[in-house]
Amino acid sequence: MDRERTCAVPDLGPEVYSRWRASEIGATTERLESQLVLELVGNVGGRKVLDVGCGDGELALELAKRGAVVTGIDASAAMIDAAKRRAVQHNADIMFQVATAQQIPFAAEQFDVVTAITVLCFVEDASPVFREIARVLRPGGRLIIGELGKWSSWAAGRRIRAWLGSRLWRQGRFRTAHELCGLAGQAGLMVESVRGAIYYPRWGFATRLLSPCDSALGRLTTFGAGFMALSAVKPAR
């Protein structure tokens, strides 16, 4: 992968997603992250939604079930193939195609909502991604960015794995809530809120003990959050 994520992220294929969701901690973490993202997305019935970095289509499918007209893009052909299979299995009408976050292949002001979940953590320069998202959003449209938190036990573990030679996490880029807000503002978007999730360490007993408190903590601070979600809108004319 080059510095702008113009190709697929190594070591991160559909089978990795499947194994993660099959684990206890993975299932709980995925549920809490999805709850936060969907809460910030709000009502999508009849709206055109673009899921940037759609992966294997899990979020795109949930948005389609809620009545959205969904398009998903991802730099990985393997992920897009998996997303298409998922849509067929659930009889969902979703358009998927291979494309990068830096060059979204759609005309300006096409979408009411854009989601981009754990995309920027593999992009060194996130500014072009925010500009592209702002370009394809309609005035009044909403962006939901979901990212890995910079100051958390999860991020510390990923840094250690990078130091030990992980190809995946050597490319990881962790940003603060302040940095994400700045990037959104530079792209002409108005930040509505930033919320945190996943405050427990990556241990099964800690997940069971602390996950019930996650939503309340996420409304108070993003410090210590393994995951953050930002909601921003494109000003109406």
Write out the residue ranges for each language-model feature.
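Conserved class I S-adenosyl-L-methionine
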Residues: M1-V44, E58, E62, A82, R142-S166, ...
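Class I SAM-dependent methyltransferase SAM/SAH-binding core
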Residues: L50, D56-Q103
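A conserved beta-strand element that flanks and buttresses the S-adenosyl-L-methionine
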Residues: T115
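Short catalytic micro-motifs in class I SAM-dependent methyltransferases
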Residues: T118-C121
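A short glycine-rich, Lys/Arg-flanked "PGG" loop and its adjoining helix->strand segment in the class I
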Residues: S127-P139
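Acceptor-substrate binding/catalytic loop of class I
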Residues: A162-E179
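A C-terminal cap/extension of S-adenosyl-L-methionine-dependent methyltransferases
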Residues: E192-R237
